[in-house]
Amino acid sequence: MSWQTYVDEQLVGTGQLDGAIIIGLDGNSWASKNLTLKAGEGQAIAALFKTPANVFASGITINGIKYMGIKGDSRSIYGKKGATGVATVITGQCILIGYYNEKQQPGNAALVVEKLADYLIENGY
């Protein structure tokens, strides 16, 4: 399965996310749908996973929008802005980023991203 297929079917295709992107550990985009990163944001997200607790002080910025950090550990970083938010999860080779809008449930959105991360980790990614 291609990275784009994971984004299209396993993330956005679930209806629980409005947009998603998969980036490498270097911060470069591998696949995306309805979500983009501005210059340097991918690298900043990758760096944030080295000290994830910093998300509580600095937040997480995606597509120029700063989200307040609500979870930050070595696996997952979540951010929220109003009724919208993002869930990011790191695997051995990539970082999954899912965006949910005000009509979608944060818990369901995060679960979709976490489940795909589990699958990728189990399969060596």
Curated annotation (Swiss-Prot):
Role according to the record: Binds to actin and affects the structure of the cytoskeleton. At high concentrations, profilin prevents the polymerization of actin, whereas it enhances it at low concentrations. By binding to PIP2, it inhibits the formation of IP3 and DG.
Sites of N-acetylserine modification: S2
The protein's name in its UniProt record: Profilin-P
GO function term, MF aspect, one: actin monomer binding
Gene name as annotated: PROP
Keywords for this protein: Acetylation, Actin-binding, Cytoplasm, Cytoskeleton
Family: Belongs to the profilin family.
Assembly notes: Occurs in many kinds of cells as a complex with monomeric actin in a 1:1 ratio.
InterPro entries (UniProt xref): PFN (IPR048278), PFN_euk (IPR005455), PFN_sf (IPR036140), Profilin_CS (IPR027310)
Main localization of the protein described in the UniProt heading: cytoplasm
Subcellular location: Cytoplasm, Cytoskeleton
Record's GO cellular component terms: cell cortex; cytoskeleton
One Pfam entry name: Profilin
CDD domains reported for this sequence: PROF
